[in-house]
Amino acid sequence: MSELEQLRQEAEQLRNQIRDARKACGDSTLTQITAGLDPVGRIQMRTRRTLRGHLAKIYAMHWGTDSRLLVSASQDGKLIIWDSYTTNKVHAIPLRSSWVMTCAYAPSGNFVACGGLDNICSIYSLKTREGNVRVSRELPGHTGYLSCCRFLDDNQIITSSGDTTCALWDIETGQQTVGFAGHSGDVMSLSLAPDGRTFVSGACDASIKLWDVRDSMCRQTFIGHESDINAVAFFPNGYAFTTGSDDATCRLFDLRADQELLMYSHDNIICGITSVAFSRSGRLLLAGYDDFNCNIWDAMKGDRAGVLAGHDNRVSCLGVTDDGMAVATGSWDSFLKIWN
């Protein structure tokens, strides 16, 4: 047996030991704890608005903190800021690269960001004196595509990339201030903790890592998925997060228990998950799928509580407003839909 093969086996044994040690610490299961909870019942949501204007596949969307405006990014080379109440376009921003994969709205509402196969995170200022939108900063540095970006504030943004790393940037100087390396596959998604001090990243190595924003340290690594992880989202209290994967499952992981608590899957669901989000209370988990649907899960019990059907192609992105009053789904059919 080669030395490398021996090391592989040892690593596998250690992994199993760690898994067993984690299991031994678990004094109870989520299923046992939530047995007394009333089921949420059947959740039915209606399409309240359809946002028409993109001319090609929509790849990403993100709500503003006002729960009214949202930004979407499409393969048509446009970033559109929408008013979800009126369905009007507030801004339509032509991009230098049409190969956009992610977009983000700053908490202040002053900036939006996007990026994709150009490997660059572009920041756009929405509140210029002239009233027009312009590029305020471009952040080059990743050696792979930009898969996700999220603002910490008007001067800091975190990006994830196909180069297997994440990065924290100082927007003012255009410099990377912290690099986060540790994944062995493309990083597909990131989610900021509610307090903004940590974030989780999901990658094509089928693992999720928890990072400290300030010091580039990987605090925890979570395994269990059997394929690429496309989406991650923090639970509203910041102590847990959910993931969506090409293995056709969503999973709930707890930071304090240091392990997986629950898996959301169904025999009829055999396609990958593109996007995940929690309701404001955390009781419902919404997940977008390759089969054109968005499933609603009872996050505590693991049962399917409803389905949002209305798109004619893959649901590529979704988001719940900060006030919890609406859900937006974006699809390869070029439309965004607002539900509640």
Swiss-Prot record:
Extract the Gene3D superfamilies matched here.
Answer: YVTN repeat-like/Quinoprotein amine dehydrogenase (2.130.10.10)
Q: Which SUPFAM superfamilies match?
A: WD40 repeat-like
Please name the CDD domains in this protein's record. Answer: WD40
Q: What is its main location?
A: cytoplasm
> Which superkingdom is the protein from?
Eukaryota
Q: Could you state one GO cellular component term attached to this entry?
A: focal adhesion
According to its UniProt record, where is this protein located?
Cytoplasm, Perinuclear region; Cell membrane
Q: Where are the WD repeats?
A: 53-83, 95-125, 141-170, 182-212, 224-254, 268-298, 310-340
Entry's Gene Ontology BP terms = G protein-coupled receptor signaling pathway; regulation of potassium ion transmembrane transport
What positions are modified (Phosphotyrosine)? Answer: 239
Q: Give GO terms: molecular function aspect only.
A: GTPase activity; GTPase binding; protein-containing complex binding; signaling receptor complex adaptor activity
Role this protein plays: Guanine nucleotide-binding proteins (G proteins) are involved as a modulator or transducer in various transmembrane signaling systems. The beta and gamma chains are required for the GTPase activity, for replacement of GDP by GTP, and for G protein-effector interaction.
Quaternary context: G proteins are composed of 3 units, alpha, beta and gamma. In this context, interacts with GNAI2 and GNG2. Interacts with ARHGEF18 and RASD2. Interacts with ATXN10. Interacts with SCN8A.
Q: What's the protein called, per UniProt?
A: Guanine nucleotide-binding protein G(I)/G(S)/G(T) subunit beta-2
**Organism, per UniProt?**
Homo sapiens
The record lists the lineage as: Eukaryota, Metazoa, Chordata, Craniata, Vertebrata
